[in-house]
């Protein structure tokens, strides 16, 4: 085995792989998005690039979660003979500031980097490389977008390396990620590339089909009857193109159309529009109930209905609970003694693989309640030692798992204390989960990104197996075909070394050092450079007027994600995060500001908290100020869609 050699390397030798060297060489030529399957050592590629760029300046590497950042920091500290510092939310702001100055390599979570840039504790001028792990997250208001813009504006010799297994299934999605990160080339490798093939293990995928139980079919019939009635009303109102076989995407689009009608109506909103919003919200809830019945079973549907009943605050929920079809569906589910046949097939598959000598198995499930049920059942199998692995968010009766507990659970799984990890979507990305011989999907996922991430948990150092459980004639089949289609579409974007995607060049983006000659297109690389320029935030932002005195602004921690703080920092305002007893902003110690959107304002009026907040604001500050933001004050409509509570 040939080992990687460099004066800055230390610790155990690292295998030098041709594809890692080739991808790194391409990344050194210009800011690049490296797209490789999970398990092919994207972190080692980043190390290759770091070794060259450390001669020119410092390096920043980011990962979206603290456990993944810790994993990167541990690897780099073992491998590099330079000072590596880990900066996460567990390190206080006061302690982080000197570490920014002392470290040659900083590994951090993007939220910490964003906050430290806004408050002026971090400067990126002398960073010669910034690495964005899980780069596909660089969309919308995610911190990666702001950090990339600030880096491009301030760095003397900027170079960006984005890393992901799945950049997006459409050209527009990939363009957005690359533009947001100031990336001008894409370097992709997969099992079709000759320099990768020796390191790829085959993964066998098997689709395991089960029938829908008769009891679930009866419940589905009740819910479909209700859904057809609700969608029929939306169709008659011109909000849907058809009254039946309506997807969740179509229902969400109907909601956007209704919100547009609200804004257009101004203060004189017809009562029918509000009623239709409730109908649309009910249809979304019924759609999730149908999905639960078909893919999970009557037990999970009853759990969803019970939680809805306990939190029946919205008008849509109250109306739905009174519908005769909904009531009948609950009666039918309560009478049912059938378990979903997926559970029995899962038991059989796990028992079969354990008997064959498989040491570790990961089972992915969409819903926490199902994950708990699976752990309970699997624990009864001989030699099975299952453990549930879920996200940090709390649900009613389920507090979730802290990052400390998550890390301990994964260590026990790695050590063999547990041999079956039953994980929700938290196990797909951003955590150091050991590779396994077998991965089981309890249900297909419609997202190509999630499909690739789940499948990437096997087939790393040995051949792997993937089982996907599918209930026939249900939404499971639609999800399967959706993810497969999107994955094939993603592959077609980069095939054959053709210039499939055109993005703004660095000169067009307005940053860095223009005028460099473009490198030739190589196998697996996509040149980016001829599309119409996508306007950046800084293009449309008025230049800040220099103030006679420096304005100092304290921002409550809860307001940082809003994007206002980063906009103020862009305009030259010194921003400091703090814990304010009242309000969202404090200007020069005198002016206290409470910021509310139209929905916040109406909500605080309805729950009676508005006047208490205003009174406290007046008592606390010399100059109290209430800012109402947005143009929907007279038209905003509050309703909830609580299906997401099932996830994670």
Could you say what each language-model-derived stretch is?
Residues 43-45, 58-76, 168-170, 368:
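Conserved Walker A/P-loop ATP-binding site and its immediately adjacent core
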Residues 457-482:
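Conserved segment of the helicase C-terminal RecA-like domain
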Residues 91-126:
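Conserved helix/coil segment N-terminal to the catalytic DExD/H
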Residues 637-648:
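Single conserved hydrophobic/aromatic residue that forms the stacking wall/gate
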Residues 37-40, 136-137, 156-171:
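Conserved helicase ATPase motor motifs in RecA-like P-loop NTPase domains
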Residues 111, 120-161:
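SF2 helicase catalytic motif II
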Residues 42, 143, 147, 174, ...:
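Helicase motor interdomain insertion/brace
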Residues 92-99, 385-388, 392-424:
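Conserved helicase ATPase core of P-loop NTP-dependent helicases/translocases
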């Amino acid at each position: 085995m040939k080992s990687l050699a460099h004066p800055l390397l230390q610790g155990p030798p690292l295998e030098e792989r041709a594809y890692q060297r080739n991808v790194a060489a391409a990344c050194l030529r210009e800011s690049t998005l490296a797209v490789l399957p999970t398990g092919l050592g994207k972190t080692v590629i980043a190390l290759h690039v770091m070794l060259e760029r450390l001669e020119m300046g410092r390096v920043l590497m980011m990962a979206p979660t603290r456990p993944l950042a810790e994993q990167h920091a541990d690897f780099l500290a073992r491998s590099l003979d330079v000072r590596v510092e880990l900066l996460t939310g567990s390190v206080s702001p006061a302690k982080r500031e000197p570490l920014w100055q002392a470290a040659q390599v900083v590994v951090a979570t993007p939220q910490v980097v964003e906050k430290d840039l806004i408050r002026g504790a971090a400067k990126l001028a002398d960073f010669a490389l910034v690495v964005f792990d899980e780069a596909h997250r660089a969309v919308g208001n995610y911190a990666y977008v702001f950090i990339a813009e600030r880096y491009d504006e301030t760095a003397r010799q900027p170079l960006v390396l984005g890393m992901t297994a799945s950049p997006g299934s459409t050209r527009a999605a990939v363009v957005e990620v690359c533009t947001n990160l100031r990336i001008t080339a894409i370097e992709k490798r997969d099992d079709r590339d000759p320099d990768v093939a020796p390191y790829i293990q085959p993964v066998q995928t098997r689709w395991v089909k089960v029938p829908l139980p008769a009891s679930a079919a009866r419940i589905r019939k009740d819910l479909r009857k209700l859904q057809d009635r609700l969608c029929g009303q939306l169709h008659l109102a011109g909000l849907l193109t058809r009254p039946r076989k309506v997807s969740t995407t179509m229902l969400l689009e109907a909601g956007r159309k209704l919100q547009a009608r609200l804004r257009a109506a101004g203060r004189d909103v017809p009562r029918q529009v509000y009623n239709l919003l409730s109908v649309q919200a009910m249809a979304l809830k019924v759609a999730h109930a149908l999905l639960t019945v078909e893919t999970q079973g009557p037990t999970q549907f009853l759990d969803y209905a019970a939680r809805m009943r306990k939190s029946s605050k919205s008008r849509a929920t109250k109306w739905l609970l009174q519908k005769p079809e909904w009531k009948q569906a609950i009666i039918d589910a309560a009478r049912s003694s059938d378990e979903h046949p997926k559970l029995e097939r899962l038991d059989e598959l796990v028992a079969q693989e354990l008997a064959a000598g498989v040491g570790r198995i990961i089972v992915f499930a969409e819903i926490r309640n199902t994950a708990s049920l699976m752990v309970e059942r699997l624990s009864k199998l001989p030699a099975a030692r299952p453990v549930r692995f879920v996200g940090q968010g709390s649900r009613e009766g389920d507090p979730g798992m802290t990052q400390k507990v998550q890390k301990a659970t994964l260590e026990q799984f790695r050590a063999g204390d547990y041999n079956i990890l039953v994980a929700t979507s938290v196990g797909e990305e951003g955590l150091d989960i050991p590779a396994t011989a077998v991965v089981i999907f309890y249900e297909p996922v419609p997202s190509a990104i999630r499909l690739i991430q789940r499948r990437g948990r096997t087939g790393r150092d040995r051949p792997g197996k993937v089982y996907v459980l599918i209930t026939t004639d249900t939404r499971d089949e639609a999800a399967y075909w959706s993810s497969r289609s999107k994955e094939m579409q993603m592959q077609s974007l980069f095939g054959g070394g053709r210039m499939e995607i055109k993005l703004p060049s660095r000169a067009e983006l307005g940053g860095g050092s223009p005028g460099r000659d473009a490198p030739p297109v190589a196998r697996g690389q996509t040149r980016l450079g001829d599309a119409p320029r996508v306007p950046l935030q800084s293009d449309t932002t008025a230049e800040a007027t220099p103030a006679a005195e420096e304005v100092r602004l304290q921002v409550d921690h809860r307001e940082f994600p809003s994007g206002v703080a980063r906009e103020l920092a862009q305009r030259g305002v010194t921003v400091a995060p703090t814990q304010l007893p009242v309000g969202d902003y404090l200007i020069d110690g005198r002016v206290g500001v409470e910021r509310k959107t139209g929905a916040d304002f109406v909500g605080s009026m309805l729950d009676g908290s508005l006047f208490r907040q205003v009174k406290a604001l007046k008592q606390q500050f010399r100059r109290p100020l209430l800012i109402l933001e947005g143009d929907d004050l007279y038209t905003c409509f509050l309703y909830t869609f609580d299906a997401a509570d099932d996830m994670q």
